[in-house]
Swiss-Prot record:
First-level EC class: transferase
MF terms in GO: ADP binding; ATP binding; phosphotransferase activity, phosphate group as acceptor; protein serine/threonine kinase activity
InterPro entries documented for this protein: Kinase-pyrophosphorylase, PPDK_reg
Protein name: Putative pyruvate, phosphate dikinase regulatory protein
Keyword set, alphabetical order: Kinase, Nucleotide-binding, Serine/threonine-protein kinase, Transferase
NCBIfam families with a match to the protein in the record: PRK05339.1 (NF003742)
E.C. number(s) listed in UniProt: 2.7.11.32, 2.7.4.27
Role of this protein: Bifunctional serine/threonine kinase and phosphorylase involved in the regulation of the pyruvate, phosphate dikinase (PPDK) by catalyzing its phosphorylation/dephosphorylation.
Reaction(s) catalysed (UniProt annotation): N(tele)-phospho-L-histidyl/L-threonyl-[pyruvate, phosphate dikinase] + ADP = N(tele)-phospho-L-histidyl/O-phospho-L-threonyl-[pyruvate, phosphate dikinase] + AMP + H(+); N(tele)-phospho-L-histidyl/O-phospho-L-threonyl-[pyruvate, phosphate dikinase] + phosphate + H(+) = N(tele)-phospho-L-histidyl/L-threonyl-[pyruvate, phosphate dikinase] + diphosphate
Binding site for ADP: 151-158
The organism of origin for this protein: Lysinibacillus sphaericus (strain C3-41)
Family designation: Belongs to the pyruvate, phosphate/water dikinase regulatory protein family. PDRP subfamily.
């Protein structure tokens, strides 16, 4: 098998070119066997491009490049043609097509997609918030949250909190159990930002039985019994009635679908 050398040349970190190179090579060598991929990141000078092309010619390497500046792409392309080196421009054609479509010139700023902006930090902050105030751990977070989820056990409160956090919403959730009084903060918050998650007793019974079996426990425990589930749902309805919040039926709904319903409601109420 022929030894394959691939140079990934980028004016940023080179992640895009690296992933494209691996995706293409895997169509010929699924395990990337006998293949060497070398990344050349932050290449923003003519001198470095000339050195890379010289090295590629010596090692008979294939070049994949993602350079946003037109003059740098042209230089690399011309040098590769002179040295008869096979090279593929990953980003240039897309930039040119988009410029024509938008009737605008690109910024040609390397690494702009990786810049850490306000949105990035807001997302990280929201994710940390969701972890800190998950499962009613600290009721002080309820009044700070953008969204509060309440519901009985196994109604997808935690995965929904995490999904919404990735949309930059600070989410806290509280499990409602008949034996435990809900935190007083729950009755103090704006009901428009609180959502009760309800599920059919039959579906909840099935989910809880599966959960018990996955833990190696008997599926006839009180936790999964029909009467217990009805008691919890009745308690849930009593609490959400006091809060005056919207109730969403999550029976057979994907987390994404429920999240979209919540986001639409939040945006409508602004």
């Amino acid at each position: 098998m022929k030894r394959l050398r691939v140079f990934v040349v980028s004016d940023s970190v080179g992640e895009t070119g690296d992933q494209v190179a691996k995706a293409v090579i895997s169509q010929f060598r699924p395990g990337l066997e006998n293949t060497v991929i070398r990344r050349f990141p932050h290449i923003q000078s003519e001198e470095l491009i000339r050195k890379i092309v010289f090295l590629a010619a010596q090692q008979q390497a294939f070049i994949v490049y993602t350079l946003v500046r037109q003059e740098m792409r042209k230089l690399l392309r011309d040098l590769c043609e002179q040295e008869k080196i096979h090279a593929v421009d990953i980003i240039g054609p897309a930039l040119q097509s988009m410029a024509t479509f938008m009737e605008e010139n690109p910024l040609e700023t390397p690494g702009i997609v990786h810049m850490l902006d306000d949105d990035y930090f807001k997302k990280i902050e929201a994710i940390e918030f969701a972890v800190k105030y998950d499962d009613g751990r600290d009721p002080r977070g309820l009044l700070q949250a953008d969204i509060v989820l309440v519901g009985v056990s196994r109604t997808s409160k935690t995965p929904l909190s995490q999904y919404l956090a990735h949309k930059k919403y600070k989410v806290a959730n509280v499990p409602l159990v008949p034996e435990v009084e809900p935190p007083e903060e729950l009755l103090q918050l704006d009901p428009k930002k609180c959502f009760g998650l309800i599920i059919s007793p039959e579906k909840l019974n099935s989910i809880r039985k599966e959960r018990l079996m996955s833990l190696g426990l008997n599926d006839d425990a009180i936790y999964a019994q029909h009467n217990r589930i009805l008691e919890e749902i009745q308690h849930f309805e009593k609490i959400v009635g006091k809060i005056g919040c919207r109730v969403i039926d999550v029976t057979n709904k994907a987390v994404e679908e429920t999240a979209n319903t919540i986001i639409e409601h939040i945006l409508t109420c602004k």
